[in-house]
Amino acid sequence: MTRALMIQGTGSDVGKSLLVAGLARAFTRRGLRVRPFKPQNMSNNAAVTADGGEIGRAQALQARAARVAPSVHMNPVLLKPQSEVGAQVVVQGRMIGTARARDYQAWKPRLMESVLDSFERLRADSDLVLVEGAGSPAEVNLRRGDIANMGFARATDTPVVIVGDIDRGGVIASLVGTQAVMEPDDAAMIRGFIVNRFRGDPTLFADGMALIAERTGWTPFGLVPFFPEAGRLPPEDAVALDVAGAGRDGSVPLIAVLRFPHIANFDDLDPLRQEPGVSVAFVPAGEPIPAEADLIVLPGSKTTIDDLDFLRAQGWDIDIRAHLRRGRRVLGLCGGYQMLGRAIADPQGIEGAPRALPGLGLLDVETVMTAEKRLVAVTGTTLADDEPFSGYEMHVGDTTGPDAAHPLLRFADGRADGAVSADGLVAGTYVHGLFANDRQRAAWLARLGAAPGLTNYEAGIEAVLDRFADHLEAHLDCDGLLRLCRPL
């Protein structure tokens, strides 16, 4: 009989996604058929499913932890921010429109139908559904029509365990305060709590755990010590980049990644961040691109035209041209590839108001935004060295021009992708996930004069998931969590 458990948090980035992934691996190893589920996610870091849909990257990692293929039903509502007040709305893998934050509230009753439909589909094919909430149930101003936290928990009668992050401080106030602001019927859905990311001697917080339990009446399910290897797993939230780009090692080649306001699919760079032979720095607003950079990467973007305007406002276009005069390399990924061309046109207003503007002019190609979004897994080889790759496309827009006659990649179905400049210093591609391929990554490192030190990226992810599952089994009452799960 299928059971379900919902993991909510006192706020964003308290570790909900990773805890669900670790529990998914732990319970899968016990022989259970586990399915991850997040009713509503907000992220521009998405993954492509086998049926050509898209879901949040965190749910794809959780599916991997559960050793099942990602499904659009694991994240039935995905919001992809395009501005400070609006987002694309993806339902069961397909974009259905764009909504402003205020207008989105009116969509929720209809979206709840899709959420419950997807949940039932997963329930029918599993022993345990691990549900992840979004943000915090303490955001009571958003409670009416909620589909992400208590609205879902109440609709399905799914028990909730809430997570607090002690590493950021104030965990007692966060947990006790969450209960204090909630309606009694919502608060009653929370059966226990987890304190995450503890550093030091856990016995020193025993009184804190007891105090939280006494004040709330919740069962303590464990104090999870900080897990340093979590940084080796692909991040979903761009907030992780604020930490990721902090350090530079002047003794190895430097890869500078432009930190666009609407950066998307930035996990493309995660395998490079783990390579000891290079240093990866995300360049924030207001800072010049380091002159010592060996490679500049223009990453994916949810709003390419706006982020191109932003790039110019930072003076990065000037830095890029100076970089090329020094004989260094530039790589554009997806939206970054579009920026490298002569022009970008959006006549249908796919990204906002219809407009067109000049590109950087570093590749002899032009892009026209199109209504149809391409979502597909791809395989093939690079034209330069015939090295194999696998990855995925996730973009709107067609890019054509003379430099496209000199593509970077050739797909297995014969199609070409990307473009390379005549001098070979500038390249662009629509393919995401290129650097997760060990031989592709090694080839790019060789071009920078660096030796690969990470021999098998994918095997490394698997090993970290197993070690994190071990970590949770050692520090959480996993048997108690299973007993809490109600049969559906």
UniProtKB/Swiss-Prot annotation:
Gene Ontology MF terms: ABC-type vitamin B12 transporter activity; catalytic activity
Role played: Catalyzes amidations at positions B, D, E, and G on adenosylcobyrinic A,C-diamide. NH(2) groups are provided by glutamine, and one molecule of ATP is hydrogenolyzed for each amidation.
Protein name: Cobyric acid synthase
Keyword Heme attributed: no
Biological-process GO terms, alphabetical: cobalamin biosynthetic process
Biological or metabolic pathway of the protein: Cofactor biosynthesis; adenosylcobalamin biosynthesis
Residues of the active site: 334 (nucleophile), 432
Pfam families to which the protein is assigned, alphabetical: CbiA (PF01656), GATase_3 (PF07685)
InterPro entries for the chain: Class_I_gatase-like, CobQ/CobB/MinD/ParA_Nub-bd_dom, CobQ_GATase1, CobQ_synth, GATase_3, P-loop_NTPase
Organism: Methylorubrum populi (strain ATCC BAA-705 / NCIMB 13946 / BJ001) (Methylobacterium populi)
Positions of the GATase cobBQ-type domain: 252-440
Keyword list, A-Z: Cobalamin biosynthesis, Glutamine amidotransferase
Family classification: Belongs to the CobB/CobQ family. CobQ subfamily.
Keyword Calcium carried by entry: no
Source species taxonomy: Bacteria, Pseudomonadati, Pseudomonadota, Alphaproteobacteria, Hyphomicrobiales
HAMAP family found in the cross-reference section: CobQ
